[in-house]
């Protein structure tokens, strides 16, 4: 028996060891079971946690989300700690089975919003800790199931508001921490029923005022001992931009000397300690109406806008009183805006009278009267005006175009109502309307057209005669949907008042306007064409300049190798001067020839070189060879020699002979190299001129010239 109990004990221990998650510590303190998994590096909630766990600690891990199955069937769980994780998402109804949960710690995570069903099923939750998250939004019904809360901590978040209606129902709440948020308003009466509340912390928000509440009258601090009485309500509101006027006078009258709250406005009290300012300096400025409409006259059926602006401290609220003495509120025919503007969408004769604008704040009120005159439309005589047509009521466009069958005629046929008005033509800015309805309404004065756009709810009214069958609506926006209604303004035969009746409504959309796009495209194309044409012209000029430069460079290069033109060649066969006769030679040869012309004593060498050239090139074409050389040298030597003989004095015979011999020896070597160069060149390298052409036809004359050159050379040697 003892062995059996021992084995049973071992089996129980083994089962317990298997149920406890890895890395966690399970404490069995009968009848409670605690599972401690803090600081274990967990990425998710362990799936094998004992469902009978009473206390579960999962703090300081890396859990990112909570799923529905993580805490399923844990009905005994009382305390759940999920602090200091990275939780950013909680599945709806994730805590639905935790009906006995008393404390839920979700502080220091990454939650950004609280949805409707996140805390569903937590009807016994007393402590909800959500501080140090990134909350920006709390759903209006998120706290509906946690009405038994005693402590709610939402501090250190980014909340601008919270569901105050849900807070108002938490009658068991005793601690509310809202510090370090961006809350700018607390509705009046929020804490009226929270009699158990002992601490409210709204430090470091954007509150300019606190609403007076009977709960705050318990906010007292014992000046002598500094101990808070159990019945005392602790209020912390430091770090807010308080506007110290008469609205905070109730708070100043509390005995609080230990806090250091300061005023942010008005300018006279900026930076001063709240509790040190005398009560008589908490002042308010009574309202003063600064701008208003003096008098207005409008045609019956048109729109009337009355304006009233006031200033004061605090900002005054503006109300309107009708000529009958009734408070005007938002209705189908009238709108009251927050800035003090009153809009009467469709005026009637009974709207004539004095409208009163009332601006009020805690310091007082101011009034201003404005006269509205409705110009009555002329009545048309009609024998059937005793027939009573029922007034369908309001004629504002929101009722006639947005409410389905209400926009139809009195028989309720919407399709027939739309068929009564047809858009014949619609462009980007205009629409042509055609009226197909029968004018059987007695006493019709005129028709009123009213329309607005999808993006602009401002009504536009047009009045047209009752005989009109078409109407052109101008100044419309392109690509915009319009709701348009036609109303008949007629005389009520029984009441003798002007009544309106919806004849028909239609919805249409204007065309898209592409004119500006095409215009911009045409401008773009025109500019592009100008740029292209200009580019072509510039490119053409550049190409022309480049061509000229290339041609000039080529001509320059050719000029360096250009053949020398030798003119005025005299024939030695007949002694006559040949006009226009020339022989072309390479530049090197022309330079040598010119040098020989300058020096008369070189004629002999030139003749020898010409003879040598003719002998070495005898294998080439005889016409080319003979045309290249002889005439050039025959023209220079005799002429220059004759000039020397005339101008120069005749020296002795021996020096002259030695000089000629030296010159002959020097020029012979030079011209021999020239002759060899000419002989080694191909025949095509020598350009044929007119003289060479004549040389082909007269070979005997050339031979005669050569013989004469030889004779002349011998004569010079003998001298």
UniProtKB/Swiss-Prot annotation:
InterPro entries per record: FN3_sf, Ig-like_dom, Ig-like_dom_sf, Ig-like_fold, Ig_I-set, Ig_sub, Ig_sub2, Leu-rich_rpt
Gene Ontology annotations of biological process type: negative regulation of inflammatory response; negative regulation of macrophage activation; regulation of presynapse assembly; synaptic membrane adhesion
Topology, Extracellular side: 18-529
Compositional bias (Polar residues): 628-641, 654-677, 702-713
Residue intervals of the Ig-like domain: 287-373
Membrane-related topology note: Single-pass type I membrane protein
LRRNT domain sequence ranges: 18-51
Post-translational modification: Glycosylated.
Sequence segments annotated as region (Disordered): 383-416, 614-719
Spans traversing the lipid bilayer: 530-550
SMART domains recorded: IG, IGc2, LRR_TYP
Annotated signal sequence range: 1-17
CDD domains, per the entry: IgI_SALM5_like
Cysteines joined through disulfide linkages: 308-357
Assigned protein family: Belongs to the LRFN family.
Notes concerning its domains: Lacks a cytoplasmic PDZ-binding motif, which has been implicated in function of related LRFN proteins.
Record-given protein name: Leucine-rich repeat and fibronectin type-III domain-containing protein 5
């Amino acid at each position: 028996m003892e062995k059996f109990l021992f084995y049973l004990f071992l089996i129980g221990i083994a089962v317990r060891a298997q149920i406890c998650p890895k890395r966690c510590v399970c404490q069995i303190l009968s009848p409670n079971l605690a599972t401690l998994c803090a600081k274990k590096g967990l990425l998710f909630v362990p799936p094998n946690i004992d469902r009978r766990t009473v206390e579960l600690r999962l703090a300081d891990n890396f859990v990112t989300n909570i799923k529905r199955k993580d805490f399923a069937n844990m009905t005994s769980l009382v305390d759940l700690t999920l602090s200091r994780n990275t939780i950013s998402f909680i599945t709806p109804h994730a805590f639905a089975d935790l009906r006995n949960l008393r404390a839920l710690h979700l502080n220091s995570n990454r939650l950004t919003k609280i949805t409707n069903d996140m805390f569903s099923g937590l009807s016994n939750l007393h402590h909800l800790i959500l501080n140090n998250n990134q909350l920006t939004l709390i759903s209006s019904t998120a706290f509906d199931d946690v009405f038994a809360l005693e402590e709610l901590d939402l501090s250190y978040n980014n909340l601008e508001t919270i569901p105050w209606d849900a807070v108002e129902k938490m009658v068991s709440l005793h601690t509310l921490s809202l510090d370090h948020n961006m809350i700018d308003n607390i509705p009046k009466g929020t804490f009226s029923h929270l009699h158990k509340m002992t601490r409210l912390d709204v430090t470091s928000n954007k509150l300019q005022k606190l609403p007076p509440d009977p709960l705050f009258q318990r906010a007292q601090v014992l000046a002598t001992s500094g101990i808070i009485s159990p019945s005392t309500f602790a209020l912390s509101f430091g770090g807010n931009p308080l506007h110290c006027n008469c609205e905070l006078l109730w708070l100043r009258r509390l005995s609080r000397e230990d806090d250091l709250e300061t005023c942010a406005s008005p300018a006279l009290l900026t930076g001063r300690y709240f509790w040190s300012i005398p009560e008589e300096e908490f002042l308010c400025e009574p309202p003063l109406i600064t701008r208003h409409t003096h008098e207005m006259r409008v045609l019956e059926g048109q729109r009337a806008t009355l304006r009233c602006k006031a200033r004061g401290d605090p900002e005054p609220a503006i109300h309107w009183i009708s000529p009958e003495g009734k408070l005007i509120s938002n209705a189908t025919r009238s709108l009251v805006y927050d800035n003090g503007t009153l809009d009467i969408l469709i005026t009637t004769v009974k709207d004539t009278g004095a409208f009163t604008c009332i601006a009020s704040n805690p310091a007082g009120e101011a009034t201003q009267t404005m006269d509205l005159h409705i110009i009555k439309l002329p009545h048309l005589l009609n024998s059937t005006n005793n027939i009573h047509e029922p007034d369908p009521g309001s004629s504002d466009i929101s009722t006639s175009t947005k409410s389905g069958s209400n926009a139809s005629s009195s028989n309720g046929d919407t399709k027939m109502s739309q068929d009564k008005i047809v858009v014949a033509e619609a462009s980007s800015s205009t629409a042509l309307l055609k009226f197909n309805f029968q004018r059987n309404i007695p006493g019709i004065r005129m028709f009123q057209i009213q329309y607005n756009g999808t993006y602009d709810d401002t009504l536009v009214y047009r009045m047209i005669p009752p005989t009109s069958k078409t109407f052109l609506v101008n100044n419309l926006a392109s690509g915009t949907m319009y709701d348009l209604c036609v109303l008949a303004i007629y005389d009520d035969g029984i009441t003798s008042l002007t009544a309106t009746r919806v004849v028909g409504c239609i919805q249409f959309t204007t065309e898209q306007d592409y004119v500006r796009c095409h215009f911009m495209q045409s401008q773009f194309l025109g500019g592009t064409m100008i740029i292209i044409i200009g580019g072509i012209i510039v490119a053409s000029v550049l190409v022309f300049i480049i061509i000229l430069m290339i041609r000039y460079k080529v001509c320059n290069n050719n000029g360096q190798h250009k053949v020398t033109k030798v003119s005025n060649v005299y024939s030695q066969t007949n002694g006559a001067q040949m006009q226009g006769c020339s022989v072309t030679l390479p530049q090197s040869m022309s330079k040598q020839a010119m040098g020989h012309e300058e020096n008369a004593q070189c004629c002999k060498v030139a003749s020898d070189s010409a003879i040598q050239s003719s002998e070495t090139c005898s294998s080439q074409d005889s016409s080319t060879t003979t045309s290249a050389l002889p005439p050039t040298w025959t023209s220079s030597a005799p002429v220059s020699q004759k000039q020397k003989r005339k101008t120069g004095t005749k020296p002795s015979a021996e020096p002259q002979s030695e000089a000629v011999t030296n010159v002959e020896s020097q020029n012979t070597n030079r011209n021999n190299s020239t002759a060899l160069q000419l002989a080694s060149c191909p025949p095509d390298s020598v350009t044929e001129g007119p003289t060479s052409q004549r040389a082909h036809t007269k070979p005997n004359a050339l031979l005669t010239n050569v013989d004469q050159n030889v004779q002349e050379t011998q004569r010079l040697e003998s001298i």
